[in-house]
C-alpha cells in the first residue's frame, strides 16, 4: 500500500525546514522511510513477490545514498535525522 496524500503532507510539514521545501534531504528520507515500512510489511505477507522485494531494495538504496550525502555535507543534521527516523546508525 502506498502513502496517502495526507500522510505525505504530514511528513513534509514535520521534517521540512520551510513549508514549501519538499526536496530537502530530510523530507525525502522521511518519505522513503515511510514507503520502506509499508513495503516491508507487504513483503512479510507476500514473501514470493520478488518484484516488490526488488522495489524495496531500490528504495533502501536510494535512502542510503541520500543519508551518505547528508553525512558528508552536515554531520549534525545527519545525526538528528537518524534519531528522528529511528534508524539504527
From Swiss-Prot:
Transmembrane segments: none
Keywords from the UniProt entry: Ribonucleoprotein, Ribosomal protein, RNA-binding, rRNA-binding
Gene3D superfamilies attached to this UniProt entry: 6.10.250.3130, S15/NS1, RNA-binding
Pfam families: Ribosomal_S15
Gene Ontology MF terms: rRNA binding; structural constituent of ribosome
GO CC terms in record: cytosolic small ribosomal subunit
GO biological process: translation
InterPro entries attached to this UniProt entry: Ribosomal_uS15, Ribosomal_uS15_bac-type, uS15_NS1_RNA-bd_sf
Subunit comment: Part of the 30S ribosomal subunit. Forms a bridge to the 50S subunit in the 70S ribosome, contacting the 23S rRNA.
Function: One of the primary rRNA binding proteins, it binds directly to 16S rRNA where it helps nucleate assembly of the platform of the 30S subunit by binding and bridging several RNA helices of the 16S rRNA. Forms an intersubunit bridge (bridge B4) with the 23S rRNA of the 50S subunit in the ribosome.
Family according to the record: Belongs to the universal ribosomal protein uS15 family.
NCBIfam families in alphabetical order: S15_bact
Record-given protein name: Small ribosomal subunit protein uS15
Gene coding for it: rpsO
Amino acid at each position: 500500500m502506498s502513502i496517502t496524500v495526507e500522510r505525505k503532507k504530514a511528513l513534509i510539514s514535520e521534517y521540512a525546514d520551510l513549508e514549501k521545501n519538499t526536496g530537502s534531504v530530510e523530507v525525502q528520507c522521511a518519505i522513503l522511510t515511510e514507503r520502506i515500512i509499508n513495503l516491508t510489511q507487504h513483503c512479510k505477507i507476500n514473501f514470493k513477490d520478488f518484484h516488490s522485494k526488488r522495489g524495496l531494495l531500490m528504495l533502501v538504496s536510494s535512502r542510503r545514498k541520500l543519508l551518505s550525502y547528508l553525512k558528508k555535507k552536515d554531520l549534525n543534521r545527519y545525526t538528528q535525522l537518524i534519531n528522528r527516523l529511528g534508524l539504527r546508525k
